[in-house]
Design a protein with these regions (language model features):
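TPR/TPR-like (Sel1-like) alpha-helical repeat modules
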Residues: 222-241, 246, 250-253
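Single-residue signature of alpha-solenoid repeat helices
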Residues: 28, 32-35, 69, 108, ...
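Hydrophobic/aromatic packing residues within the alpha-helices of TPR/SEL1-like helical repeat arrays
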Residues: 32, 36-39, 73, 112, ...
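"A position-specific structural signal for the A-helix of alpha-solenoid helical repeats
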Residues: 13-17, 55, 90, 94, ...
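Residue-level recognition of tetratricopeptide repeat
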Residues: 20, 58, 93, 97-100, ...
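Residues that mark the junctions of alpha-helical repeat units in TPR/alpha-solenoid scaffolds
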Residues: 8-12, 32, 49, 84-91, ...
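Structural motif corresponding to the intra-repeat A-B loop/turn of tetratricopeptide repeats
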Residues: 26, 63, 102, 143-144, ...
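Solenoid-like repeat scaffolds
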Residues: 2-6, 40-48, 77-84, 114-125, ...
């Protein structure tokens, strides 16, 4: 074929690709890319099909050509039909690994939105849909500083349940409300959140009740602040949250002392 002695039709190309796939290591992946480079000379459009782009992306990644692999996988993702959710999620997974490697949070959000869009049109479990909403919101909040957008996606990821993902999403929305100087909204959200089933051994249990204690403290709602500070202080939280628990315990003692002094003054 390379010496132009044989036309590279579909059958011959399949034979060539099969032969290259029988090889091992770098020889195999270089051979695959060379085969597609040769095909391009005969019919460029055939190198741009969905299957061809995936093949080339896989080979490029195996050879350490991460930038090149991203281009191939991105094209494949664009061509993948929404109905083929499994393929879309597979390609999103390939690109996720590459974008995480280069810390490209903007592109991660783009591919997660593609997954979300396909899942929304499908009859797959809502849990999968909420997972991608969570990932979008997470990257927008912590890496891209797009707080308004992050809030929308994090709210979509919270189905009102008690999974770690849902609890974390609702907590972050409350934090965003606080940052937006909307304490009443944050308080309302945290109160609703505290009513869900949350393990007293979890970090979130401490964080939620500490935040509630702080917000009630600012409102001078002493009884409520005392109650939530005590919840936070008495929880069996992970070691890294002991400092917050110590602060909660100190705040609870201060409020209890203050309430006692008021009661004494009133006779």
């Amino acid at each position: 074929v390379k010496e132009n002695k044989r036309k590279l039709d579909d059958e011959n190309f399949k034979l060539l690709l099969f032969a290259e796939n029988q090889k091992t290591g770098r020889t195999k992946y270089n051979g695959i890319l060379d085969a597609y480079a040769l095909l391009e000379n005969y019919d460029k459009q055939k190198t741009l099909t969905l299957e061809s782009q995936i093949d080339q992306g896989y080979a490029a990644e195996k050879l350490g050509g991460y930038k090149r692999a991203k281009i191939y996988y991105r094209r494949a993702l664009k061509k993948a039909p929404d109905e083929n959710v499994d393929l879309i999620l597979q390609l999103v997974g390939e690109l996720k690994r590459l974008y995480e490697r280069s810390k490209d949070h903007k592109s991660l959000v783009q591919i997660y939105k593609r997954a979300y869009g396909a899942l929304k049109k499908s009859s797959r479990p809502k849990k999968e849909l909420r997972t991608y909403a969570y990932l979008i919101g997470y990257h927008q909040f912590f890496h891209l500083k797009q707080n308004k957008n992050a809030r929308v996606w994090l709210m979509r990821s919270d189905g009102g349940g008690s999974s770690t993902q849902e609890l974390q999403s609702a907590y972050w929305v409350a934090k965003l409300d606080q940052q937006a100087k909307k304490p009443e909204l944050a308080l309302k959200r945290l109160k609703e959140l505290s009513g869900r089933k949350i393990s007293k051994k979890s970090a979130l249990y401490v964080q939620i009740h500490f935040e509630l204690g702080t917000l009630f403290h600012l409102k001078e709602n002493w009884d409520s602040a005392l109650r939530h500070y005590r919840f936070a202080a008495k929880a069996s939280a992970p070691e890294e949250f002991k400092k917050i628990q110590t602060v909660a315990e100190e705040k609870a003692k201060e409020i209890a002392k203050y309430l006692k002094s008021i009661k004494a003054a009133q006779g």
